[in-house]
Amino acid sequence: ALDTSNKKAIEAGISVYNRSKGKPIVNSADAAGRIEYVDLAAANDAIVIALCNGEGIAKDNDERMMYCQTLLERGMEHGMEPTDLWFDPLFLVVKGMQDKQMEVLECIKMFSDMGLNSTGGLSNNSNGMPKHIRPIMDSALVAMAMMQGLTSAIVNPNDLRPVSYTHLRAHET
């Protein structure tokens, strides 16, 4: 993923990207000050990680879905396919916000039910925890998120524990 606030750097990265590996990924847009990154992705036939927040973190799933709708409409207005927006509900720190984890998992399920792709930075979940606990927390969260339909995850490539859960699939009803 091209992860910088420098638009010229993103455009330069896209211009040399080997598309035989799939579309480049722009990380990230939101429904406020970074919404123009949706336009940038659309203009370059790229995928964009669409953060479900505005000026601040969404307070609940209604607000997350409102931001999701704004980003989806913006992308479609610029010719993007809905599958080229990967929605990030923003995994929150579990320390002190345990109740928010279930909301994020429910939001992933909502995306999945709508046929939308989802992603997220899973290590946010364990931020501030002892180093030896973080892989366990992140592994548990990725397993739960995948069961809700998580499409992809932004994980620490040096921590292979989350990868061991890639065989899980959402339960079909």
Please state what every model-predicted region is.
Residues A1-N6, P24-A32:
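Catalytic beta/alpha-barrel core
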Residues A1-Y17:
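N-terminal active-site wall of soluble small-molecule enzyme domains
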Residues N6-E11, A32-L40, M102:
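Active-site-adjacent beta->alpha loops and helix N-cap segments on the catalytic face
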Residues G13, F87, A145:
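Conserved, mostly hydrophobic/aromatic
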Residues G22, R34-I35, Q98-E106, D113-Y165:
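Active-site-adjacent loop and "lid" segments of alpha/beta metabolic enzymes
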Residues S28-D30, I57-C68, V93-L105, H132-P135:
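Active-site glycine- and acidic-residue-rich loops that bind
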Residues A32-L92:
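Conserved anion-binding
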Residues T166-T173:
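Conserved small/polar residues in nucleotide/adenosyl-binding loops
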